[in-house]
């Protein structure tokens, strides 16, 4: 009986958390299908005539397509480089006697301490001096600082929890340090490491402040383009804003689904 109550409480708490997390997205989807008059009514309307005009207005804007392409290129490159550099670095910190290990970990964590407002002006000055302002390269390097620190920090405890006996057994079979990492540690920890990669992707995909400061038109990301819809005319186009929010949330969901399927196929293949 006690176990049933405990399980029921866990399910209830999990359901409540899921409801709180999904409610904003559900509300955005609902409002994106409404006319403006249905959105601004004092009493929320759940019965209305749906319309796709908001999505048509968003998708008909060439800036949205350019922003989507910029976001995919910039975020994809920064996350891929962050994972390629951060995961091996985390394994080295977790498994080998690296000098200044604690200082390195504190430095990685300190990169998340500073708010974007504090570093926006120095970053603008640096990229303007280098002639790289409003370029994809400057955004990739800037976001790489976020993804690299996040993935490395989250991956260190994952490798520390890996039993050393597994690696020692592989070493006895003739595996070198690199082979132990690529063929043993990485496949075993892949499911957990995926969480850090997805988290860093969501962080930089939704980032607005730095993108707003470091881009103007050529390299503007999708959040920057979506924020411009708030200044269309004298009335706030809530339907268009909600439609752009829904479209902004779709790529991370697709990314998570594709990465999960790829990981599952790799695990089954082994």
Per-range role (PLM):
Residues 6-270:
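A structural signal for multi-pass alpha-helical bundles of membrane permease subunits
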Residues 1-4:
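Short, Lys/Arg-rich, polar N-terminal cytosolic tail immediately upstream
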């Amino acid at each position: 009986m006690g176990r049933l109550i405990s399980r029921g409480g866990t399910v209830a708490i999990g359901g409540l958390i899921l409801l709180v997390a999904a409610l904003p997205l559900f509300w955005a989807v609902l409002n994106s299908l409404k006319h403006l008059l249905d959105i601004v009514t004092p009493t929320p309307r759940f019965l209305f005539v749906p319309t796709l005009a908001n999505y048509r207005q968003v998708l008909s804007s060439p800036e949205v397509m350019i922003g989507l392409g910029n976001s995919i290129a910039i975020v994809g490159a920064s996350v891929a480089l962050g994972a390629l550099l951060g995961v091996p670095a985390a394994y080295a910190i977790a498994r080998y006697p690296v000098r200044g290990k604690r200082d390195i970990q504190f430095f990685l964590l300190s990169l998340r301490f500073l708010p974007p407002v504090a570093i926006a002006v120095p970053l603008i000055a640096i990229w303007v001096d280098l002639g790289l302002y409003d370029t994809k390269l400057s955004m990739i390097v800037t976001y790489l600082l976020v993804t690299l620190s996040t993935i490395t920090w989250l991956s260190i405890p994952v490798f520390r929890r890996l039993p050393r006996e597994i690696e020692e057994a592989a070493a006895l079979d003739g595996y070198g340090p690199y082979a132990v990492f690529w063929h043993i540690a990485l496949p075993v920890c892949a499911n957990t490491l995926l969480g850090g990669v997805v988290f860093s992707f969501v962080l930089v995909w939704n980032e607005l402040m730095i993108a707003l400061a470091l881009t103007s038109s050529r390299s503007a990301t999708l959040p920057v383009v979506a924020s411009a819809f708030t200044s269309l005319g004298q009335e706030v186009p809530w339907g268009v804003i909600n439609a752009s929010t829904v479209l902004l949330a779709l790529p991370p969901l697709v990314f998570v689904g594709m990465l999960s399927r790829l990981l599952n196929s790799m695990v089954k293949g082994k």
